[in-house]
Design a protein with these regions (language model features):
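Acetyl-CoA-dependent GNAT
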Residues: 47-50
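Conserved catalytic-core motifs of GNAT/GCN5-like acyltransferases
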Residues: 3-6, 23-39, 43
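Conserved active-site alpha-helix within GNAT-family acetyltransferase domains
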Residues: 8-26
Length: 50
């Protein structure tokens, strides 16, 4: 299992991860404070193939 988190607003990165086989597992709202504003974070994971 490989997991990652990415800012929800970073659509290009999310598409790239999806193309690499990652799937969205959840969203944490207002989790990261960046430039004075709270941002949503998407958690993604890729599981080993059996």
């Amino acid at each position: 299992r490989i997991s990652l988190r990415v800012l929800a607003e970073n659509a290009a990165a999310r598409r790239s991860y999806e193309k690499a086989g990652f799937v969205q597992e959840g969203v944490f709202h207002d989790m990261e404070l960046l430039d004075g504003a709270y941002r949503d974070v998407v958690f993604m994971a890729k599981l080993a193939e059996n």
